[in-house]
Amino acid sequence: MVEESIHSSIEVIIFAGMTKHSAGLLLYRFREGVLEVFLVHPGGPFWEKKDLGVWSIPKGEIDKGEDPLDAARREFEEETGFRPEGIFRELTPVRQRSGKIVHAWAVEGDCDAAAIQSNTFTLQWPPHWGSQQEFPEVDRAGWFSVDRAKEKILDGQRGLLAQLELVLRGEGKHQ
């Protein structure tokens, strides 16, 4: 009953029509004692030569009536081809520069960043006179130390990395 009430409240907030909301997963692992996070690079010609400050957690918009965690899991799978399992730790939502609110969950896991299989989108390229072309939503992925990830990730998502470190520190898994 309480869970239904919370879900209904979240849905009212998400679909009030004023702010866009997306949901994603912050996948993490430990390699030789170093905390690493999994980030994706947006596909398409606009992002092709951009690197620092454009990477993201795998995420996407929440469909009407969809549970935000279910949306996060769906989006991760659509953008990477992988479906992480484990304990999903809800993080405090962050607001990106665009105004979009990102709901995120941290989950420990592993996947081969070189083996991602992303969904695609269609775009007229070049704009105004080019032809319709298909591009991957995500063109590459990588595992990064938290310090390196702070350089790579969108400014508005950097707070998710700090939250992950705090959660893991509280569990005695990170210094």
PLM-predicted stretches and their roles:
Residues 9, 13-14:
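Short, positively charged and aromatic/hydrophobic N-terminal segments
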Residues 32-34, 44-47, 63, 98-99, ...:
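Short, charged/polar surface micro-motifs in flexible loops or helix N-caps
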Residues 93-130, 142, 164:
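Active-site-adjacent beta-strand/loop module that shapes the phosphate/pyrophosphate-binding cleft
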Residues 131-146:
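Alpha-helix-centered segments that form part of catalytic cores
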Residues 147-175:
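Charged phosphate-binding loop/patch that engages nucleotide di/tri-phosphates or the phosphate backbone
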